[in-house]
Amino acid sequence: MEIMEKLKLLKNNIANIISLLIIPNSLVSFYFIIQEEVFLAFLFIIICFFLDTLDGYIARKMKIVSNMGQAIDLFCDLIVYLMFPIFFIFNYLNFNLFVTFFICSIVLISGIIKLARFSKEGFVVINNEKYYRGLVVPFVLLTTAVFYILHINNFIYINILFPLAIILISILMVSNLKFKKISNFAWYILAILLLWMIY
């Protein structure tokens, strides 16, 4: 009976365990930013992204969605999609310290508001289609990766275009515009493509 209870406890927390695996992997990614190993930094943060999508999938399939799980997921999203890009920006896309402080503050505030709002409201469902109210926070990470690739390929006016892009994303995250949910498969392909381009 004791074994069965432990197995049941494990089953009920499997999604949370997967979510918590994001923490050590994200710490490794931060370490590689400091060590100037950009490819490895993005490799580990993409592993975090895969874990983030996996925990949600398992929670829904096993019907073990809980308030605790949602809270853990919220904090993990904050680390992966907001704190990692901000730390990366300060190290690799910092063209002007004042501007960097400004855009990172704006995107962090907007991202936290977006996460809190989604935690409270969830999806907007229209004609059985799922929509997000406001742009999703992974676009902060995506934009940071894209502009880093442009930067290392000597794309001009990055110092102007990148801050403008971050400000635009910040506005879109807290807007009431509706964005259709992108499939995980599409995100996976995009993540692999970006990783290849960074390599």
Predicted regions and their residues:
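Multi-pass membrane catalytic core of lipid/isoprenoid biosynthesis enzymes
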Residues: L10-L20, L27, K61-F118, V140
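Topogenic membrane-insertion module of multi-pass membrane proteins
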Residues: M1-T53, L172-I198
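Hydrophobic alpha-helical transmembrane segments of polytopic
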Residues: I18-L21, A41-C48, I103-I106, S110, ...
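Short glycine/serine/threonine-biased micro-segments
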Residues: I46, L54, N67, I109, ...
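Helix-coil boundary and interhelical linker segments in multi-pass alpha-helical membrane proteins
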Residues: V28-L43, I79-C104, A145-L161, I198-Y199
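Membrane-water interface of alpha-helical transmembrane segments
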Residues: E5, L9-S19, Q35-F39, Q70, ...
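C-terminal membrane-associated helical module and adjoining short loops/tails
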Residues: M1-I3, N128-Y199
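C-terminal ends of transmembrane helices
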Residues: E5, G56-V65, I112-I126, I171-K181
